[in-house]
A protein has these predicted regions:
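Transmembrane beta-barrel domains of Gram-negative outer membranes and organellar outer membranes
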Residues: 29-282
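Cleavable N-terminal export/targeting peptides
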Residues: 1-39, 281-282
Length: 282
């Protein structure tokens, strides 16, 4: 990837987002976590739970290989803040953002810039049980800086997550469905009718190491042919929870192979991630 001034600006902006979220989190919770209030395995379990009570700021970098007719390289930096709120003694609200910064090869318009932003809000009962679920709306904001890395559409729909914690294992499914409902002038391509399916299973160890197998499958229901409809990667990652001064964080590395993708889609990818984590205020 060619590191441009825009790339450095995006990285600085991402760092600012992380610092603001960390600074706004309760200092007492941070002290308790660093002092052992939650051990590494418990933090690892919460990181594997998409709707846990952690304020987290993942910086996820993906290298997608085999993109376009020339089998080029696409890089995607996803910033994915997760902020939970307790709205009543029995209910939590968890807000999740996905803010991508994309660099595409020349065969796909050689575009680099901010992609569409996705916001999800889950309402989850605070039952204290091993079966956890949450449901709510998901919205895509057409904030892309280049038409080639965005849909040009406002989209919305439902989202759902269901998971089970069984000892050291966590397994479940995150799902959403998006339909476009408004168009950005002169930038729209086609209407959005897209499903997202993320089944996952994670094995957490007392050391804070987590082994995860998951998929982030996308179904383009408007695709003209079956071969263009599905994008199905199988991803395997290893992550480790540790501390940086008073703050716990996680590092992750992994790879994925695409068992199905459109003709212009990738063949395989590499992933690294760094996640700042902080327990939310009780």
């Amino acid at each position: 990837m060619r590191v441009t001034s825009g790339t450095w600006a995006a990285l600085c902006w991402c760092g600012l987002v992380a610092l603001c979220l960390v600074a706004s989190a309760p200092a007492r919770a941070a002290h308790d976590a660093a002092a052992g209030g939650s051990d590494a395995q418990e933090l690892a379990k919460k990181l594997s739970n998409p709707i846990s009570d952690l304020v987290s700021v993942p910086f996820q970098f993906n290298w997608e290989n085999g993109v376009g007719p020339d089998n080029g390289l696409r890089t995607v930096l996803n910033i994915q803040p997760v902020v939970p709120f307790q709205i009543s003694p029995k209910w939590n609200m968890i807000e999740r953002w996905i803010m991508p910064y994309v660099s595409q090869p020349e065969a796909l318009n050689n575009a680099t810039g901010l992609g569409d932003i996705t916001f999800s809000s889950f309402f989850s009962p605070n039952t204290g049980k091993s079966l956890i679920w949450g449901v709510g709306p998901v919205v895509t904001l057409p904030m892309s800086s280049d038409a080639a890395v965005g849909s040009g559409q406002w989209s919305a729909g439902p989202t759902l997550v269901v998971l089970k914690i069984h000892g050291e294992l966590i397994y479940g499914l995150l799902w959403n469905q998006l339909w476009s409902y408004a168009t950005v002038s002169k930038r729209a391509r086609v209407a959005v009718n897209q499903g997202f399916f993320q089944p996952f299973i994670a094995w957490t160890r007392p050391s804070g190491v987590t082994l995860t197998l998951q998929s982030e499958s996308i179904a383009n229901w408007n695709a003209g042919t079956d071969s263009d409809r599905w994008t199905i990667p199988i991803n395997a990652t290893v992550s480790k929870v540790t501390t940086l001064g008073p703050f716990p964080f996680s590092v992750l590395g992994g790879a994925g192979v695409y068992v199905a993708s459109p003709d212009s889609g990738p063949d395989w990818k590499l992933r690294v991630a760094f996640t700042l984590i902080l327990p939310s205020k009780k």
